[in-house]
Amino acid sequence: MTALDEAIAQLAQSDAALRASIAPLSPTQWTWKPDAATWSSAEIAEHLVLVERGILFRLRTAPADGLEKTEGKEQVLGQLTQRTVKFPAPARLVPTGKYPAPADFEIDMSTARAATTAWAQNPDTDLHKHVMPHPVFGELHGLQWLLMIAQHTLRHIAQIREAIAHPEYPAG
């Protein structure tokens, strides 16, 4: 399996896990949050779409100026799924309440993930040459960004599971 195949598999697995996490949620559960500072499942879902669309837009327009700045970052990216460290979202990636129901989100997420996968699998795309900065991890190339998208999704699935495990989480 190539590195691209592995990244595409991680994207597919994280997408399936996300859908499985939100599928059973009632409208009340979809919008519930334990406190004002914590995102609801709906807000997490919106954030994931905003991030993925933003990354793809930036990658498509990133200069193809090399791999050397990004060596060894795959190991660092593995830390992204750990919820012990918080990464505050920039204002442009903070949810605004766009998705009143999971079905609304699923359409946009499917479109975003399909666009990401299609771009990555395009034979004219050299993933290693499209480099752009991450606010925490520094310069990453396109393949590393694909891994980051998958791991970012897994990180937020863990956040949804934390909400579901909360003692005040609504029954339905």
What are these language model-derived features?
Residues T31-T81, Q121-G172:
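Short, contiguous alpha-helical
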Residues L4-Q10, L18, E43, L50, ...:
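Soluble, non-transmembrane catalytic domains of enzymes that act on hydrophobic metabolites at membranes
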Residues Q13, A17, P24, T111, ...:
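Residues on one face of amphipathic alpha-helical coiled coils
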Residues Q10, V76-K129:
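Acidic/histidine-rich alpha-helical segments that form the ligand environment
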Residues M1-A12, A16-T38:
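An N-terminal domain-cap segment
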Residues M1-L4, K98, P135-G142:
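A short, mixed-charge helix-start or loop-turn motif at secondary-structure junctions
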Residues M1, Q13-S14, P27-T31, V85-P90, ...:
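Short hydrophobic/aromatic-rich motifs at helix boundaries and adjacent loops
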